[in-house]
Amino acid sequence: MTEQDAAIVVKPGTVSLDDLARVLAGQPVVLDPSFWPRVEAAAAIVAKAAQADTPVYGINTGFGKLASKRIPPDQTALLQRNLIVSHCCGVGPATPEPIVRLMMALKIISLGRGASGVRREVIEQLQGMLARRVCPLVPQQGSVGASGDLAPLAHMTAVMIGEGQAIVDGKTVSGGEALAAAGLAPLTLGPKEGLALINGTQFSTAYAISGVLRGFHLARAALVTGALSVDAAMASTAPFRPEIQALRGHAGQIAAAATLTALLDGSDIRLSHLEGDERVQDPYCLRCQPQVAGAALDLITQTARALIVEANAVTDNPLVLVETGEIVSGGNFHAEPVAFAADTIALALSEIGAISERRIATLVDPALNFGLPPFLTPDPGVNSGFMIAEVTAAALYAENKQRAAACSIDSTPTSANQEDHVSMAAHAARRLADMADNLAAILGIELLVAAQGITLRAPHATSAPLVAVIAALREQVPALGADRYMAGDLAKAAALVEADALPAAAIGVLPSDPFPRLA
């Protein structure tokens, strides 16, 4: 199989979230050949401008506050190289390889639109690095999301020209060594090419896309753990009736309620308390699941739409208008749409965890759990059961609540006030990874607690889909009897939630991918 055969062939302007999810899973990308003529036409316009007397930002001028400084033609290559190494100012831990690879793929898509003015060789260098698994070492911190993700993209570009550092087979090597080992030669940047590579939102967008995909997955998993909690608490399914959802009309709410109903259909536990149950209404954490989970699903779908647009966008500056031959300065590098999207995803992640934590608290409380023992241990007192697991869920929710504060409103001026309003998209998107980790752990705890509650409801059993979920859990974690070391149980349950390892019996009734595609 050739590199071309293994790669996703991308057509900028029509790339889907499915395509990008495959990149996160490890597939490389190559540009559809039909886009090369436009790429080459834009590069020719830039080459002509580099030899002219008229100042054009970033081609024959300095950058940022130094835009008034003219650069002679014989120094344009040096200008681009110096731009890259001077902007390699990232700090902090290395960005995970899947995010770096997605960032590189997004840059290929953006450059492939033929409005950046780079030569074909630039895109081919990125394609070669992806195909041969040359992963630039990109520190996570240092971008404010305007003028693009300068520092992270500079670290990516440094490896393209044989400088900086890369990770190959888990080892950190110089950029030059990484290219040589992959059979690639260092690239010499032409006019505007360094600027086109580091000016853009691809770092922030890569993190945000990963966040929206994980958010949708965890929102679906929360419907499974939430359904388990309904039966563990012997709660009512009447609030999930379709007539109630239709009277409000939100698509996510309707889908969430239908999913909960399907997951609980046929439950003997539910049938056992249809008569003689004196409770009138359940707590909100059980009763209002469609409203909360549905709102989260709707938010995730809306942000996905914005991120699909951004993934297909040209976000550097200046831009080449091939039809007119002009090179025009603009502001597409400003990552406000990404920052808003990331802030929105953070809200959804936080609220899914908030209501899950309340369900956990309900199930361990003998005043609320309708006849179950305190902390769901068969012998309370000498055993503490799930007492501290609930505390852990509360701690994780508190962390996510703090992280959910909007980053996009926290602008600060940079570059001698030339770049006087910034998006903070990089920070907004980066925190989603930690928030998703916390949410997976919270849902894992709910999975353990709700499964324990259902086990204690014997001889009554839950529905067939939920029996299958509990069986999958029990392959990893036995029901809790006497107290035991719990950290391993929590880790296994979180991994089950995160890995999409829930049984087909449950997955078959979950909401399907709602994400729009660009035609």
From Swiss-Prot:
Its EC number is 4.3.1.3. There is a cross-link at A146-G148 (5-imidazolinone (Ala-Gly)). GO terms for cellular component: cytoplasm. It catalyses: L-histidine = trans-urocanate + NH4(+). Its main location: cytoplasm. It is an enzyme of class 4 (lyase). GO terms for molecular function: histidine ammonia-lyase activity. Disulfide bonds: none annotated. Keywords: Cytoplasm, Histidine metabolism, Lyase. One of its GO terms (biological process) is L-histidine catabolic process to glutamate and formate. It is found in: Cytoplasm. Pfam families: Lyase_aromatic. NCBIfam families: hutH, PRK09367.1. This is Histidine ammonia-lyase. It comes from Bradyrhizobium diazoefficiens (strain JCM 10833 / BCRC 13528 / IAM 13628 / NBRC 14792 / USDA 110).
